[in-house]
Amino acid sequence: MIDLEKARSCAYQANYHLIWATKYRRKVLLGSVEVRLEEVLKTIAANHGFLLLAARVHHCDHIHVFVSARPKICIPEMVRVLKCNSAKLLFEEFPEIKLRLWGGHLWSEGYAVRTAGVVTSAKIEEYINRN
């Protein structure tokens, strides 16, 4: 049996793999900035009602984030909160980052998202078609 999280009106397992890049793919996420970003994202997630399961910077210019959230949390809003708040905090703590970027933006506009869970699409289709 799959362990589901429980809310007042539903049971769920909602995990998301999020990926986004720095503006212009600038390689600014290194050293203490990289370490601090991973800490900051964990705090931001906790403060906004979702759980950061993992976060890792790749090639100093983009980050992979794995989060678990209640179904009522909108994915674009979750990404917006993570990107906006992390940029604000990193710019305050590491003003030298701004020298590599212009326009006041740390992150590019877009992001990628994938869902993740224990049950595969094939298993869901099989279950639906069987019953």
Question: Predicted segments — roles?
Answer:
Residues 1-131:
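Basic nucleic-acid-binding interfaces
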